[in-house]
Amino acid sequence: MTRENIFVRSLESCETMANASVICADKTGTLTQNEMTVVAASVGIHAKFVRKPYRFLGGEVSRGSIPGNFGPAGDLSSPNLAITPELAKLSHAAITVISTTFEDLDPETGAAVFIRSKTDTALLKFARELGWTDVKHPREATNILQMIPFSSDRRSVGCVVKLPNGGHRLYINGASELLTKGCTHYAANGATRGGGVETAPIGKAEGDSISCTIKSYASHALRTIALCYRDFSHWPPNGARVTDNGEVRKVFLFGTPNV
């Protein structure tokens, strides 16, 4: 069981599983191949992508459109052609810096594999497919001030980094249906004069579009993850409450979704 990376909290559970005859799971791939893969993505609101025609629940979803979404969807291999370099760099940082997954060699095959979280592995593989830099470079080049571990209450994980301009940035990845409710802006496909990412306010129409996108993915048994961030001049921010274990509260109500 150790070789298979199986953690058993209670020994009685082994006997329970030995008598199980049916296993029901809501995520495809975790049982069949023991891995997860990014098959669709949305950047901001208007840029949507899907992998080459794939099937879910017996039905095919082509890259021409995603049911319930607004507008057509491009090929998942082409986000670099549709978004700015600034937005691509931000997305890459949100994926790599916040993750604790590392790369190692498989003792049986000798191939390079990612170790730990299956979800993080899927995101890191997706970043590699797009030709973004490796995992180590962003982490080594980033001054990480605080890691905020995953919590089942907020269903998200966070990381605070210090920016070259002296400011601070909070990255948050997690359940999209929760994180997007606290977001005030979304990432637009543009760049500011200072080389940052252009953002636009989330109004009712934009909020409905984001909600529709999330529901569309969920209807195809997909796990939807939101990549969000917020910049601060100081960390911890003024008015924030720091708990005994060093965790900062009341800072997760804003961000820019980049699903």
What is each stretch, according to the model?
Residues M1-V259:
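Conserved cytosolic headpiece of P-type ATPases
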